[in-house]
Amino acid sequence: MAPDPVADIVVDARGLACPQPVIALAKAVRDAPPGTIASVECTDAAARHDVPAWARLTGNEFLGERPLAANKTDGGAFALTVRLR
C-alpha cells in the first residue's frame, strides 16, 4: 500500500455538519492549481459521501479516507483527501 500523500492544503472541518465540510473544502481550493492535494478533517459522517461526490462532480480525484489520531476529544475524526485536476 502506498503511503498517504502529504496534503498541500488542510481544512479543519471537525464539528461542522453537512454540508459545511465540503463547502469549506471547495472554498479552500478555489484558487489552487491542478495537482494540489487537499485534505479535509471531519467528524460528520455525511462528509464520507459528500467529499467523494464533490470530487467526482468537479472533475477532481478522491484519494481516500484515513482516521485521525484517536484521543478523547477527536470525536472519531477522519481526513478525506482529494487531488485537484
Predicted regions and their residues:
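Amphipathic, hydrophobic secondary-structure cores in small proteins
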Residues: A13-L63, P67
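Intrinsic-disorder/low-complexity, polar/charged segments enriched in Ser/Thr/Lys/Arg/Asp/Glu/Gln
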Residues: D8, G35-S39, A77-A79
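C-terminal edge-of-domain segments
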Residues: P67-R85
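Class I SAM-dependent methyltransferase SAM-binding "motif I" and its flanking Rossmann-like core
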Residues: M1
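Immediate flanking context of iron-sulfur cluster ligation sites
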Residues: D4-A13
